[in-house]
Curated annotation (Swiss-Prot):
Its EC number is 2.8.1.7. This is Cysteine desulfurase IscS. It comes from Pseudomonas fluorescens (strain ATCC BAA-477 / NRRL B-23932 / Pf-5). Pathway: Cofactor biosynthesis; iron-sulfur cluster biosynthesis. It comes from the Bacteria. The active site is at 328 (cysteine persulfide intermediate).
Length: 404
């Protein structure tokens, strides 16, 4: 077993060797290096053929038409293109947008930008289980609502929203529905023929593909129109200009193909690993699971260890690569905005650690990690006066601390 152990698969995943092999065939002079937009020679034709094959592979995983897949630089760009693209195209129909307080920053900051441009945004508060229900969305709808954007699987707590039910609601009201699917590909079945979803963002690097490439599903029936945010040579039917990165795209296609093949077996294996880990730490007192116990992916276990400061715990777990919050905001010492929105107090939000498991996690690593967590929590609590007070039966929430 090699140290440190990687348990941060929701931040990024390593590229699968099968994917790396396919990518390497698209780089060198002997390989498939042409520009897919070059129409006049075989180098361009071959590159275009590979790009279209990858488009089919991505579409196959989510049961979409390949013509509905638009290549982008990642899920952040897909979120921006979907939300700004819809807002700017349909602004004459209405200026109201709906999202939730626990979306990824790529959605929240895009919404904030649109607010500066004069749009109105309603931010739905999730339940304590971290879920956004159709009833919550319905309560936020107005006559001038043009778009609802709700994530499929939450990146911090791993909860799965019922996007089928939310889609039924939005479609019946004539409101467009965007879903951030960055964390759900390869973990949850997605059938875009059945789901009433108009736009969906995808990322390769959360699904054992390369970084720097993603896609946006843009429904053809019913047709969704977007205003482009990137202008140039009119690539991707005018929605996203820029020379297509053949090697990245081939990598994403292969990664989604592998995900489709392996998903059923892999989910069972990861559920077993997640259960194995939790069984070994659940004896710790004052341990809380963040997010719904039932509607969640097994890949994510977000735990709060009360009376232990999360950053101290991460330092103590030097052989484990884990995080407190999402990778995009983990440099900030503010408590997780996602956990705060769930109603967790500052102390519990600060004492949370996200363990995320994946394709290359082993039982041996799980056992080692669980043992280290138990040791570190016990040791840090032994140093904590608050833990002593709790053990003595003092209700710490009732204490009035004097200001210095």
């Amino acid at each position: 077993m090699k140290l440190p152990i990687y348990l941060d698969y929701s931040a990024t995943t390593p590229v699968d060797p099968r994917v790396a092999q396919k990518m390497s065939e698209c780089l060198l002079v002997d390989g498939n290096f042409g520009n897919p937009a070059s129409r006049s020679h075989v180098f361009g034709w071959k590159a275009e053929e590979s790009v279209e094959n990858a488009r089919r592979q991505v579409a196959d995983l989510v049961n979409a038409d390949p013509r509905e897949i638009v290549w982008t630089s990642g899920a952040t760009e897909s979120d921006n293109l979907a939300i700004k693209g819809v807002a700017h195209f349909y602004h004459t129909k209405g200026k109201h947008l709906i999202t939730s307080k626990i979306e990824h920053k790529a959605v929240l900051d895009t919404m904030r930008q649109l607010e500066r441009e004069g749009f109105e945004v309603t931010y739905i508060e999730p339940g304590e289980d971290g879920l956004i229900t159709p009833a919550m969305v319905e309560a936020a709808l107005r006559d001038d609502t043009i778009l609802v954007s709700i994530m499929h699987v939450n990146n911090e707590i791993g909860t799965i929203n019922d996007i089928a039910a939310i889609g039924e609601l939005t479609r019946s009201k004539g409101v467009l529905f965007h879903v951030d699917g960055a964390q759900s590909t390869g973990k949850v079945d997605i059938d875009l023929q059945a789901l009433k979803v108009d736009l969906m963002s995808f990322s390769a690097h959360k699904t054992y593909g390369p970084k720097g490439i993603g896609a946006l599903y843009v429904s053809r029936k019913p047709r969704v129109r977007l205003e482009a945010t990137m202008h140039g040579g009119g690539h991707e039917r005018g929605m996203r200009s820029g020379t297509l990165a053949t090697h990245q795209i081939v990598g994403m296609g292969e990664a989604f193909h592998v995900a489709k093949e392996d998903m059923a077996a892999e989910n069972l294996r990861i559920k077993a690993l997640s259960d194995r880990f939790y069984k070994q730490v659940e004896h710790l007192e004052e341990l809380y699971i963040n997010g719904s116990m039932t509607a969640r992916v097994p890949h994510n276990l977000n735990l709060s260890f009360n009376y232990v400061e999360g950053e101290s715990l991460i330092m103590a777990l030097k052989d484990l690569a884990v995080s407190s919050g999402s990778a995009c905001t983990s440099a900030s010492l503010e408590p997780s905005y996602v956990l705060r929105a769930l109603g967790r107090n500052d102390e519990l939000a600060h004492s949370s650690i996200r363990f995320t498991f994946g394709r290359f996690t082993t039982e041996e690593e799980i056992d080692y990690a669980a043992q280290k967590v138990c040791e570190a929590v016990t040791k840090l609590r032994a140093l904590s006066p608050l833990w002593d007070m709790y053990k003595d039966g003092v209700d710490i929430s009732k204490i009035e601390w004097a200001a210095h």
